[in-house]
């Protein structure tokens, strides 16, 4: 019975693909929760991916700007990137085998392709308190809530008998407090930029810059999985990029800091650092499993420690200038 259902399901998808894309599917294999691998008799395989309503606008926007370093979906018979099927939006894109490129090389290349995406799509926009207040109020509420939960958890440890394990967590907590202090300092600087109505470049950001979202095809490099992309500030892409690849042995000073500090404004670098710490704090999963909490605090401590190591020169320079 199950085999019959699977066969019927395949036939439905096969008809959908052939009718809308003139592609004859020989098989349809689960690839991820959102994608299926389409195997064809021609040897040119494809990915079928469920997506969002506004993806078509994103690909049209990038195509109109002439972006050539992204993998575009195949056009259907109606000359659209996205097709409706059973109340779901789908697109089909060429499938390429993952290349055996070392992570250090892929990290450098991914940053380069993100920079190309940003440069092609940038346009100036003035920061305004009215447009920025809601975003910062929301981020501040999220941080305040998480710091409150962390403080309550630490107090619960301190009120009980202190053990070697609880001391381990307590010894890591001070770095989280350092991050809190740094977030407040950076937020004040960013708010000053906003109050000054500073003009900054907005770009199309990938918004999910992982190494697996960079493909190598016959010597060329392409970005994929731009479904969550949006117009924003490049600092967000670079913050997610840094957090995702912080443990890879590459020169962060060369590939990120110099890029952000070469701009006319400190806003990009400040916002990048703010977002990195924001991600670190938000991802701490507070739960009732004591040994899991030891792991959570260890991970947070190591990440924040590395943050201050990577960005300490800039921070010290700023503080010294303020003293002078």
Give residue spans per PLM region:
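ATP-binding pocket architecture of kinase catalytic cores
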Residues: 41-129
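Gram-positive cell-envelope targeting signals
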Residues: 1-4, 9, 58, 66, ...
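Active-site acidic catalytic loop and adjacent metal/ATP-binding pocket
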Residues: 35-39, 73, 184-236
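Juxta-kinase regulatory segment immediately upstream of eukaryotic protein kinase catalytic domains
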Residues: 1-25
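Active-site activation/catalytic loop segments of kinase-like enzymes and analogous catalytic loops
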Residues: 234-265, 276-310
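ATP-dependent phospho-/nucleotidyl transfer catalytic cores
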Residues: 129-204, 310
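A glycine-centered beta->alpha junction motif in the catalytic cores
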Residues: 88-102, 151-156, 280-299
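Charge-rich, low-complexity terminal tails
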Residues: 181-184, 298-324
